[in-house]
Design a protein with these regions (language model features):
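A short glycine-rich, His/Asp/Glu-containing loop-to-beta-strand
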Residues: 1-30, 36, 86-87, 91
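Short hydrophobic/aromatic patches on the structural cores and recognition surfaces of FHA
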Residues: 6, 44-46, 60-62
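Conserved A-loop
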Residues: 21, 45, 70
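Short beta-strand His + acidic residue motifs that chelate non-heme Fe in jelly-roll/DSBH
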Residues: 30, 48-49, 55, 71-77
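Glycine- and acidic-residue-biased ligand/ion/polar-headgroup-sensing regions
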Residues: 34-51
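Short acidic-glycine-tyrosine-enriched beta hairpin
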Residues: 51-67
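Ligand-binding loop in jelly-roll beta-barrel domains
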Residues: 58, 67-93
Length: 93
């Protein structure tokens, strides 16, 4: 059984997959990337900040956004968060 969730044309994009560990009480200032980003939380809880909005995601949650929009990351807990991150990097000239 398949349930349609997301479709994105990938022509000329580079796929990068990472496992990311965000240590307790960590804050990363906003930055932007030249990629579409898909994040799935394996363990822990983190907050992604976008302009005036903050999104909290925990185990089993998935977040997809355009990394061109500046975004911050915060782990305000005492536990390390573990994320599965997929980057679709745009071509550069």
């Amino acid at each position: 059984l398949y349930k349609y969730l997301l479709s994105q044309e990938l022509a000329n994009y580079t796929l990068r997959v990472n496992e990311v560990h965000i240590t307790p009480n960590t804050y990363r200032k906003p930055l932007s990337t030249n990629a579409l980003e898909l994040i799935h939380v394996l363990e822990g809880t983190v907050q992604y900040g976008f302009k005036d909005e903050e999104v909290s995601i925990g185990p089993g949650d998935t977040l997809y956004f355009d990394g061109i929009v500046a975004h911050s990351v915060r782990n305000a807990t005492e536990l390390t968060a573990r994320l599965f991150k997929v980057y679709l990097l745009r071509p550069t000239d």
